[in-house]
Amino acid sequence: RAGVSIGGTSPLPLPVEIRSIDAYNPTLALMLEGNAIKWLGKTKKWGVITGVRLETKNMITKATVKNYGMEIIGNDGNRLKGNWTGGVKTKVRNAYITVPVLGAYKINSRLRAKAGIYVSYLMDEEFSGHVYEGYLREGDSTGEKVNFSDGAIATYDFSDDLRKFAWGVQAGVDWRAFKHLSVFADLTWGLNDIFKKDFNTITFAMYPIYLNVGFGYAF
């Protein structure tokens, strides 16, 4: 199976620190999977699906925030940590190897539904971006004010703080369009924070939520 992933990595619900989402670009995120199904019983209505999936989970967003936990990198390489108010651009580009374990139900000869869990290992990671048109309060919301205006930006990079193992739930449908060709749609919803437990710059958990759509060859 091959397809694309469309979605984002987001806190749920949106915290008060995020005042608005100003731009969103899912970018091109590809997935490739091989799986097998074992039908059970005489009627073969129920089955179990497992396999291996290579996938990327990407997005680029712009948001307006207030008192948003941040650690920026200055032009001199020094890091400033505190609360940011202003614009934030975020780029997420993560590559995983994923093993789903799903229960399947055959609705008819062409259509089947499936749901279950998945576990993923992060192979290549990026969570970075920059801040713009705003100010940083060093330390906390009452700290010294550092302004960024007139096109000035400061970068940040939390890639090394991403968790290597992830898990979540998955549900979707497969439709057999032709004898050997099927199309599919799967929703995957992460259930653990993408950041490591000891990472506290961003003060809320973030979860990957993506829709995979594509086609597959059935043997």
Report residues per predicted region.
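Extracellular/periplasm-exposed beta-strand and loop segments of Gram-negative cell-envelope proteins
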Residues: 8-27, 57-95, 122-166, 192-210
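Transmembrane beta-barrel strands of outer-membrane/channel proteins
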Residues: 2-6, 50-56, 115-121, 185-189, ...
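Repeated loop/turn-to-beta-strand initiation elements of outer-membrane beta-barrel proteins
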Residues: 44-48, 110-113, 179-185
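Outer-membrane beta-barrel architecture
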Residues: 31-37, 100-102, 172, 214-216
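Outer-membrane beta-barrel transmembrane strands
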Residues: 91-106, 162-168, 172-174, 183
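A hydrophobic membrane-anchoring alpha-helix module
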Residues: 174-176, 180-192
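Outer-membrane beta-barrel "beta-signal"
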Residues: 175-180, 207-219
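Outer-membrane beta-barrel strand-turn architecture
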Residues: 38-42, 105-109, 177-179, 219
